């Protein structure tokens, strides 16, 4: 194996190794066969009270070398990274530079991005609905949709009649919207009974108090009665509006009439 010494993690490096057997090989296939890249991560705990720098080197999607500021030196993850680890660990000045990047890079960038990233808060929108409109006492999936929030750390819990549900919960995990907001679905598998109240509770840094949204299990007859009541109310409003319209129109017509014999 030929070892090619690499530079520190300052940019992604693409190595194109092409075997040229026939003269036109490069023309037919010039895709990159081997990819080497580096990924720098700054981990913050309680603001900048504790900061950890993690610098990871990959070759063809496999990590082979890393620098961990908690350790203070390079560590070979695979044999491929051992020559570089030994080379860089033998350079005291270079190691001191890497250790100092906890302050010169991580804490420095934290202070710059503090206002528009660290302190940014967007409140979540929470809705609750069942996936099926079938009668009660049948298996159903209640969905708590939490969308458009930032930052991503969020806690979603389900309650039934005030008691937290620990089992039957499925989540999509955190989904990035691509606009600096997140969304997630937290679902509860259950068999709703008449009169039960299900509550989705959401806690997020943007909220001073948890947000709770309820879903009440109702029988078909109760739903029909409610719909009939709503329909009757809407119908009553329509008749009231029509009556008022006719009344005011007649009043306007009468005020416009003039007694006969008067000159204008």
From Swiss-Prot:
- Which parts of the sequence lie on the Cytoplasmic side of the lipid bilayer? 247-264
In terms of InterPro entries, this protein maps to: Ig-like_dom (IPR007110), Ig-like_dom_sf (IPR036179), Ig-like_fold (IPR013783), Ig/MHC_CS (IPR003006), Ig_C1-set (IPR003597), MHC/Immunoglobulin (IPR050160), MHC_I/II-like_Ag-recog (IPR011162), MHC_II_a/b_N (IPR014745)
Which segments sit on the Extracellular face?
27-225
Locate the region Beta-1.
Answer: 27-121
Q: Where in the cell is it found?
A: Membrane
In this chain, the stretch annotated as Beta-2 covers 122-225
Q: Where is the Ig-like C1-type domain?
A: 124-214
Which residues span the membrane? 226-246
Q: Could you tell me which cysteines form disulfide bridges?
A: 38-106, 144-200
Q: What PROSITE patterns is this protein classified in?
A: IG_LIKE, IG_MHC
CDD domains in the record, alphabetically?
IgC1_MHC_II_beta_I-E
Gene3D superfamilies per the record?
Class II Histocompatibility Antigen, M Beta Chain, Chain B, domain 1, Immunoglobulins
Entry keywords, A to Z:
Adaptive immunity, Disulfide bond, Glycoprotein, Immunity, Membrane, MHC II, Signal, Transmembrane, Transmembrane helix, Ubl conjugation
Q: Name one GO cellular component term.
A: MHC class II protein complex
GO terms for biological process, alphabetical: adaptive immune response; antigen processing and presentation of exogenous peptide antigen via MHC class II
Which residues have a glycan attached per UniProt?
Answer: 46
Q: Signal peptide location in the record?
A: 1-26
Q: How is it modified after translation?
A: Ubiquitinated in immature dendritic cells leading to down-regulation of MHC class II.
> Its topology with respect to the membrane?
Single-pass type I membrane protein
| Entry's family note | Belongs to the MHC class II family.
What is the recorded name of this protein? H-2 class II histocompatibility antigen, E-B beta chain
Species per Swiss-Prot/TrEMBL record: Mus musculus (Mouse)
């Amino acid at each position: 194996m030929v070892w090619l010494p690499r530079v520190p993690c300052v940019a992604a490096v693409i190595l194109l190794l092409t075997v040229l057997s026939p003269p036109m090989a490069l023309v037919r296939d010039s895709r990159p066969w081997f990819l080497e890249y580096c990924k720098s991560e700054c981990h913050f705990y309680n603001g900048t009270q504790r900061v950890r720098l993690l610098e990871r080197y990959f070759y063809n999607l496999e990590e082979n070398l890393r620098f961990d500021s908690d350790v203070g030196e390079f560590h070979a993850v695979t044999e491929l990274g051992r020559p570089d680890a030994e080379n860089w660990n033998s350079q005291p000045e270079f190691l001191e530079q890497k250790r100092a990047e906890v302050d010169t890079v991580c804490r420095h960038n934290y202070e710059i991005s503090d206002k528009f990233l660290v302190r940014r808060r967007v409140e979540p929108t929470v809705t609750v609905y069942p996936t099926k409109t079938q009668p009660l006492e049948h298996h159903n999936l209640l969905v708590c949709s939490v969308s458009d929030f930032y930052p991503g750390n969020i806690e979603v819990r389900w309650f039934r009649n005030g008691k937290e549900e620990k089992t039957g919960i499925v989540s999509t995990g955190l989904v990035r919207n691509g606009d600096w907001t997140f969304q997630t679905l937290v679902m509860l598998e259950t068999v709703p009974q008449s009169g039960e109240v299900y509550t989705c509770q959401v806690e997020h840094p943007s909220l001073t108090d948890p947000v709770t949204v309820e879903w009440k299990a109702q029988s078909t007859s109760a739903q029909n009665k409610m719909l009939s009541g709503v329909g009757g109310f809407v119908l009553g409003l329509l008749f009231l509006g029509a009556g008022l319209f006719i009344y005011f129109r007649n009043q306007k017509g009468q005020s416009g009439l003039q007694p006969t014999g008067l000159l204008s």
